[in-house]
Amino acid sequence: MKLIIFTGLALLLIVSLIDVEAQNEGACLPRGSVCTTNHAGCCSKLSCDCYRRFEKGVEKGQKCWCIPTGLRYSKEKE
């Protein structure tokens, strides 16, 4: 009887840990999401990369996105 109770509690603990892990993973920002700073909560293997936008020489603000770590975008030559 003790073995059945112990096994049930162990299974409940494992299921609870799996659920908590799934909730923590869902709390991060996926690829392509807008983030606010370089230290935002992008998912693992992603970083928050920011750039400044200019239109006709006038700064239009800063945009930040969650992109794969190490990936860099550059301006296309016209």
Swiss-Prot record:
Prosegment location in residue numbers: 23-26
Disulfide bond among keywords: yes
PTM summary: Contains 4 disulfide bonds.
Signal peptide extent: 1-22
Gene Ontology molecular function: toxin activity
Similarity field: Belongs to the neurotoxin 19 (CSTX) family. 07 (U7-Lctx) subfamily.
Lineage, top ranks: Eukaryota, Metazoa, Ecdysozoa, Arthropoda, Chelicerata
Tissues showing expression: Expressed by the venom gland.
Subcellular location(s) of the protein: Secreted
Keywords: Disulfide bond, Secreted, Signal, Toxin
Annotated protein name in UniProt: U7-lycotoxin-Ls1a
Source organism per UniProt: Lycosa singoriensis
GO CC annotation terms, alphabetical: extracellular region
Alphabetical list of Pfam families matching this protein: Toxin_35
Keyword Secreted in record: yes
InterPro entries linked to this entry: Spider_toxin_CSTX_knottin
Principal location: secreted
